[in-house]
Each structure stands twice: as C-alpha cells, then as structure tokens.
Amino acid sequence: MLLAAPGSASAAASPSPSATPVTYKIGIGQDYDGMNPFSSWSGISWESFRLGYDFLTWYDEDYQPAPDLATSWETSPDARTWTFHLRPGMKWHDGQPLTARDVAFTYNLILDTQTPAYIQYLTGVTGVTAPDDVTVVITTRKPNAGMLALYIPILPEHVWKKVDPDHLDTFKNMPFVGSGPFRVTELKKSKWVKLEGNPDYPADLGGPPAIQALYYVISQNTDSMIEDYKAGNLDAIVDFPATYEKVLAAAPGTTAVAAPAIGFHELAFNCWSSPKSKGDPLLRDAAIRRAVHWAIDKEKIDATSMAGQAVPGTSLLSPAEGAWHWDVPAADQYRYDPEKAKQLLEDAGYTDRDGDGVRENAGGDKLEFRLAALNEYPEDLAAAKMIVSWCRDIGIKLNLDQKDEGAFGDEVYDNADYDLFIWSWGGDIDPGFMLSTFTTRQILNWGDSQYSNPEYDRLYVRQAEALDPSDPGDTSKRKAITDEMQKILYRDDPYIVLWYNVNLQAFRTDTWRGYDQVPAGNGAPFWNYMRGTYTGLRPVSAAATKPGGLPAWLPVAAIAGVAAAIVAVVLVRRRPRAVEDA
C-alpha cells in the first residue's frame, strides 16, 4: 500500500505521558506564508498541506496514480464518468467523520468560485456528487486525462462552509483541521512551523507517525544553520546552496544527496499587454526576450552558482518528469552567442542612438529594465549578477533589485509590478498544472509571466481532454500536444529556464532510520511528493529523542523541552494573497 511504514507505528507513537516527545527538526532557509491552501505558495506551507490533508488519489514511488482517500475507482466506457470508492472510517483531526460529502464539497467549492488556485485541475468537469458516504462520482464534458492527478487537498465541509466564498484566500485556517498523518499546531513567523503526529492515522496509509512533533526551523543564515546541524541540533537541512554539499557529506553520521527534482529556476519576463501592467511594455517584444536568451551562458551559471550540480534548462517540463519533458533538438537550442543576440536586436530596430551603451527603439525608449532576485536564494543572486553583465554586453541595461520573497510575491501576483525576475517552481508530477500557468486565465493568478497566447490556450484544453477511453494508460496523444505547447513557450520566451531543480538535502542516519529516498537509492527523502519518510522515520535509540542544543538563531524560551530533529526541502512556489500570518 501507499505510504507503508516499517515496524510497529502504534507502539512507537504512544509513549507514556511523561516521556519526552519524539521530535524531529528540519532546517530550511525559506519562511512560510500562511496555511491557507487557496492562497499559500511557499515550500513549507505546501509540504505541510501534503502532510496535513489527504487527497482523492496520490502517487506510488514510481509516480504512478495510487490510492489515498480513494482505494479504487472505475470509469464509464466513454471515460466521462469516474466513480471513486473511499476508505471507510476516516476522520478529521477534530474527530469528525470524513465522508464523500467532504470530497464533493471541496470540488464543488472550486467549481462554483472558479478559484484560480485549483480550477485548472477540474477542466471540463460538469458535476461532482456523493451518492453515499464512501462514493464520489465525477462527470466530465469530455474525457479528462488528469483525473487521477487532482492535486487538490480535501477540505472539511464543517469548517470551510462557514467561510465566505468571496474571501477564501484570506481565511487564516488556524486551528488547522485536516485528515493527514500530521496536523499543523503552531506557527511562529520567521522561526518555525510545528506539526504534531496524528495518532488515529490509518495503518494501511502508514499508521500513526513515530514522530510526535515535527518542526520546520526557519533560518536566513546558511552558515549558522549548517553549524547547528553539525552540532546535532538539527536532524536534517534542505535546499542549501550547492557549494555546501561536500561539506555536509563529510559530516559524521550524515547522508547528503543532490537529487534531480521536478521544477526549475527561471528568468521570467512581464509579458502582460494590459494597461494595468506595471511592467515595461518593451518586453512584450519577443525579439528582446530571445536576444536575452542567446546572451546567457547557462553552462557557466551551473558551474558557478550551482557548483556543477544542476542541469542547464531548456524546455519547461524538467527531465525528472520523464516522458513529459520535451527534448529540444540540438539544432533548435539556444546557445551562448552574444553576437547573435546583438544581431537580433539590430534587426528589430534597437540600436544605441546616443552612444551610452544602452540600445533604444525608434522612439528613444531605452532597453533598461528592473531585474529582481531574492535574498533567500544566493544561487539566484549569483545568476542575476552574471545575467546583468551579459546583457550589458549586448546593449541592455538591467538594474538588479534584491528583494525579500514575501513582499516580492505580492508585487508579482497581485500587482504585476516587475520587469524581469529570477525565481523557481516546484511543479507537479502531472504536467497539467505547470502548463496551465501560461494560459490567459492565469494572468494575475499562477501566471507570473502574465503571458497570453490563444493558440496555447486551445492546446491546453486539448491536452486535458486527450484520453483514449479504450486505453486510458496511453499518453501518446497527450504527449504530442504537451510537446507542442513547450515548443511555443521555447519560441516565445516568457520564461528562460536557467537550470532544473536539484534536491540538496542532508540528514542524520546515525540517529534515525526509515528514510524513504525517491527514486530508490539515490533520491531525496523529503520534498519528493511522498509521505514515506515522515511516517516511516524511527529513532535508532533513545538518544535521538532527547532534548539537544538549540539552533543558534532560535530564542531558548520558544523551544524549551523540544527534542532535536528535522526534515528536508525542495521549494514549491504557490500563488500568494493577502493572508495574515499567525
């Protein structure tokens, strides 16, 4: 079964009341941005949702659809009616029963409000009903190729029915009520997120976790975080700069991995043509975007800012997504060629008319733009500085603006107040979500390049419906369409994919066992879309659960009595809204 854990979970998870809680702490450089699944976008928030909520279906370790709330399902002969059978006896964290009504409520809430956070998953869905407590029936206008990849946390109707549908994205969602193996119980901005194990989690989904208190410990100082890890005050750290990987690998009792991951780091352009856009209108010209692409040396970025650990990017979907990645033919790939970049700009009418080194258009508007990069990600800042230099060489002036991630998220998603930025995506296992972020309906929502292309929009609908009822497992038709969509994006350059994500994680193997590395053997144990590590970890000895030294950046009073241990991270970006943090 999915998420099966070794050993006896119930015995490990039920110590006497006086025993020290079994505690695990994970160090991470990114802060959370709330616990509202309709508006939060940070990696910590979404890893908490994966642990705190259940989903209709999930994935096995080969990233194939597998049971979660639903134990089985079948389709009608025309693949337009899907019937899901839920596991009985599931409960919410507050003890209320979880039934098919909650699933239907969640999906219908999304359909009724058309919330951009999830509506792309329900493309073509015409109805969701719950004929009884353990049956969900979904009907679609046409076959839906992503029906087993609905990345939508199932919400408790008895909590969310009280929320004004027009203000879903401002609900704090604390106390947190989910059904997963962990429950979010405490938030301390810029300090930590605390989750507690669910003692009632079903055995066939991994059972109650042995970890009773799980902390994501937040630090903006990589050096101090690594020193605390080496001192035994943290059990794992994640998403650290690539230059630290060898240092951590040499630490006693440590395994360090640099595993290929879904997603990428990108240079994005503000392509929005609306009068509301606050981006420079010159960037709507694809010739400028293509010239910038030719001016970038991705191999040097990898060698310099990623210590050679990453793979330079080409098409949108990463190689970690298997067959969905479009392998760009060698003859069509952008290569570092500043002379070609200059010629593209010349041909498009951009010349240096006043001799100051910056090109202008015929009207005298200079190719001078803002480039935002985030303080939280030193590898992005390093790449940004190189890109500024390369663009200067071809007559484009970029003014580097270092930002904090939280404030910058508001500028991008709520106001479109930017020209270019470097940031990252985690993506989904199924290609539908990532491709949806370039559809017109996602402008000022997930679509942070504000890109619009009617041809691309039509292809998005076609790929979602590319399911052969006679052979639902055949993805060849959908693959052909998603390849075409990636070709369009590679041609139009709303994004320049700089490099594909690498899961950089270090974790203690001398004090903990049960790490579930995905892919098996050399993959990452955390941020791998699986819950197996969280439900399967067991302390090697009582020493692993004793209170240890405190991370240097945390106040002692705030974490007194908490034992040492943590989990790992690959950041997933999600759409922000005006959610107040606890």
Question: Where do the language-model regions lie?
Answer:
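Ligand-site clamp/hinge motif
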Residues: 170-173, 200-247, 383, 388, ...
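Extracellular/periplasmic solute-recognition and catalytic clefts
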Residues: 110, 127-129, 185-196, 215-276, ...
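Alpha-helical secondary-structure segments
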Residues: 25, 99-106, 133-139, 180-181, ...
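Gly/Pro-rich hinge or "lid" segments in bacterial periplasmic/extracellular proteins
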Residues: 60-64, 153-208, 213-215, 223, ...
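Surface-exposed binding/hinge segments that line
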Residues: 85, 119-162, 186-188, 304
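N-terminal lobe/hinge region of extracytoplasmic solute-binding protein
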Residues: 27-77, 108, 177
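Detector for C-terminal structural segments
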Residues: 188, 192, 197, 260-265, ...
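A structural "hinge/loop" feature
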Residues: 29-49, 69-71, 96, 118, ...
